[in-house]
From Swiss-Prot:
One protein family per Pfam: Lycopene_cycl
Keyword NAD set for record: yes
Binding residues for NAD(+): 11-39
Similarity remark: Belongs to the lycopene cyclase family.
Keyword NAD (UniProt): yes
NCBIfam families to which the protein is assigned, alphabetical: carotene-cycl (TIGR01790)
Protein name (database record): Uncharacterized carotenoid cyclase DR_0801
Top-level taxon: Bacteria
Amino acid sequence: MAPFSPASSDVLVIGGGPSGTALSAELAARGLDVQQLAPHPPRPFPATYGAWLGDLPTWARGCAEQVWTDVRAYTGPQPTSLGQPYALLDNAALLRTLRGLADWTWVEGAALHAERSGAGWTVYGAGGERWQTRLVVDASGHGALVSPVRFPGGAALQTAYGVVARFRRPPVTPGSMVWMDYRTPAPELKRGEATFLYAMHLGGDRYFVEETSLIARPAPTRAELRRRLLARLSAQGTPPHATESEEWVAFPMNAQAPAPGGVLAYGAAAGRVHPVSGFQVAGALSDAPGVATAIATALCQGKDAAAAGWAALWSPERRAAREVHLLGVGALLGLERAELPHFFGTFFGLPREQWARFLHPDTDAGTLARTMLRVFAQTGGRVRLPLARAALAQPAASGRALAAAAGLKI
């Protein structure tokens, strides 16, 4: 006989990452009976999470393992100082802080699918389990177990391979964080897709170094990026002395704003990945209180909690902003390898408040569109042409973006 949980929770959150844990904590803090379902017990999140310090909610800034003020980008031979603090999150501290906000039940198991069951939901597990709940939330990450999102033209991926290692010679300037280094010291880096170095000095002789493909379709593989990283480090005379750990990431960047309805999703499962940077944790931590309040209010009033959650997570303003972001994705995908450094050279040459707002997780469509127009106006002709092609390929969306830039509503 299949295991069955007769006790119905108010909310069952699928996923054990930062997004699911943050939402579970905020829901429980509002007096709801919450179950969080993950294939493992509570444990520090395994990925490396960085964020602009100012994008994190105030409480989360105390969970920073390290903060750099020397943050730079190389889109040519000389560095551009970005002048904005950047944080590496301490995942154990983040989990500890979230778990300390409220009490909720952590359930070990793997969800397969969810179905409507009367006024609530039944979630079916891989081991034959069944969990009943008034509301189910899919926060399972980029895999989106029960609420898949759509990617226009197919998923365009960000892929990256990195290591934490010890170096006899520093691979980047000690004390610095390199957000993007498009220089090509090795022949390997002059072929194929453009990739860049993302690096953090962790103290002493320890560094995190990662070769990243910002967005591509198809994207470079783990093996390709590993070769590129090692070629880069070898060419600049800084091979790793002792590798402590490896990291590989691959996730889609071009999610459409999901249609409301069905299973409520959260975080990356809801498409809340920034389509230009790939960041999502700062946004998920910031969104959790508002989404939790909307859900709790709807459940208390006997209203559709999933609809309330979707409305809080994907407002009309956010949907308009995502459409503008996807125009930017089309532009990036249309740029040749040699054009990307020029594009970002222009981007980071804008006043800091302009490019920083573009990279912020919650910027309005008009501000985004005006920044894109400034980049178009200031960049060189060989970059401007593919940007124009990308805009002309989506005339309706481009028209709405221009209207937003002008402050018009259409």
